[in-house]
Amino acid sequence: PHFGMVAHAEEFSKNSDSFSLQDAVKFAKLSKDNGTWLSPTLTAMVWIANQTHSIDSIKNSPTLTYVHPLLQSKWLTANNYAKNASPANETYFDNMVQFHFQLVKEFKNAGVPIVAGTDAGVSGVVAGFSLHDELGLLVQAGLTAQEALNSATLLSAQWLGIDKQIGSI
């Protein structure tokens, strides 16, 4: 209660033992009842899950060339997601990604406002490109293309209280 926004769907998945539909519905209802918005940052969790499978997900990313060389090095050599990779972690993060998609669907069904966010800077999450990825993932999770676009424009401006000046296309 009394949180205006939860940024990162993982804040909910950390409080779920089963990643169940019932938990997704419960979290959506709790958020709706308390006026809490969601910025799921699906792209960050997808990149994290990919890295538990292989560091090649970053090495082979076409967007890596747009990242500063020092950050590239950190992502490739000091990457705890890749270093701690195991079949159990792969399964855990893959299941978490699917739960986050379910959360978005249930939050939408409950009428909870969803705003786009990316957590740019997480290994593999490249500013700019990641917003495009996030919009696509929001559609995959059940938002319409218009709802996804609104999540990055009008709803974001409403959240900031500046929708009279910006946020419309």
Which functions belong to the PLM regions below?
Residues 134-135, 153-156:
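Buried hydrophobic packing segments
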Residues 98, 126, 144-149, 157-169:
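Acidic, glycine-enriched loop/beta-strand segments at the rims
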Residues 15-137, 141:
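Active-site neighborhoods of metal-dependent hydrolases
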Residues 9-15:
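Short, acidic/turn-prone active-site loops that include or flank metal/cofactor-
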Residues 1-6:
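Functional cores that coordinate and move charged inorganic groups
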Residues 40-41, 116-117, 146-151, 166:
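Surface-exposed patches in mature extracellular/periplasmic domains of secreted proteins
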